[in-house]
Each structure stands twice: as structure tokens, then as C-alpha cells.
Amino acid sequence: MSSSETQKMQLYSYSSSSCAWRVRIALHLKGLDFEYKAVDLLKGEHLTPEFLKLNPLGYVPALVHGDIVIADSLAIIMYLEEKFPENPLLPRDLQKRALNYQAANIVASNIQPFQNLAVLNYIEEKLGSDEKLSWANHHIKKGFS
């Protein structure tokens, strides 16, 4: 039995991160026990040597399950769905499943990046705060249309 079979999962998360929300929701819907580890992005805790040793990408959420570390919300959710098939998150019907993947990818690729603090700060630095809001609103509305 691997160490991931017997160890409690740890979720490194920032309370306001929509990416982290997705994983917390999935863990709860699947009824999985995990330990919540707060990472304060505003204080730069994701950039500390300790966190970067665990997760060189410096992203939250990050899920640790035994010797496995996964640092992307959709990858984490896919791992949970495969590893713990009880209480499935996805429908069995292939077409409905594909629509779920489509919605998840639109959020992850087209909407969420414009809610990311690093992206918003960069846009504001280069173009100003009015342009930052304009960019973010444009891409978020487009993703939901």
C-alpha cells in the first residue's frame, strides 16, 4: 500500500482564491477528509522557500496526498475523481460530461486568469486601474456569454 493510501490529504489554500474554492467544494462533495493549510497570498506565503520546496510552481491550491503533490485546481479535481470514485462529481453520460469539461475549461482558461492577483496587478502596472477593470470585465463577460 502506497503512502498516499494511508495518509490524510493536506490542502494548501488561500481563502479568497476561486481556484481553491473549487477544490474545497469537490473535497466536501466527495466526503473526503483533509487538513486545511492556509497560505496567505497577500503576505507572499506562496513564495517562501518552505512553500516553494513543496510546490515549485508557487500556486494555490496545492494538494498533498502522501508523496504526491498536485498544484492545479482542475488537475486536483481530476485526481480526486479518479482516486476516489465514490460520490462522483461528473455525470456518467458522455455528452453531459463533455459539457462539464467545457465549462470548467472556460472558467480556468478564459475567466479565472482575469481574477488572478498577479495578472490584475501586472495589467494595472502596465495600463492603469481603469484598463485593468475594463480588461477583466471584458474577458469575464465573454466567458459567461
From Swiss-Prot:
Pfam families: GST_N_3 (PF13417). This is Glutathione S-transferase 2. Keywords: Transferase. Glutathione binds at residues 17-22, 60, 72-73, 112, 116-118. It catalyses: RX + glutathione = an S-substituted glutathione + a halide anion + H(+). Its EC number is 2.5.1.18. Residues 93-145 form the GST C-terminal domain. InterPro entries: Glutathione-S-Trfase_C_sf (IPR036282), Glutathione_S-Trfase (IPR040079), Glutathione_S-Trfase_N (IPR004045), GST_Zeta (IPR005955), GST_Zeta_N (IPR034333), Thioredoxin-like_sf (IPR036249). Induction: Accumulates in response to the phytohormone ethylene.
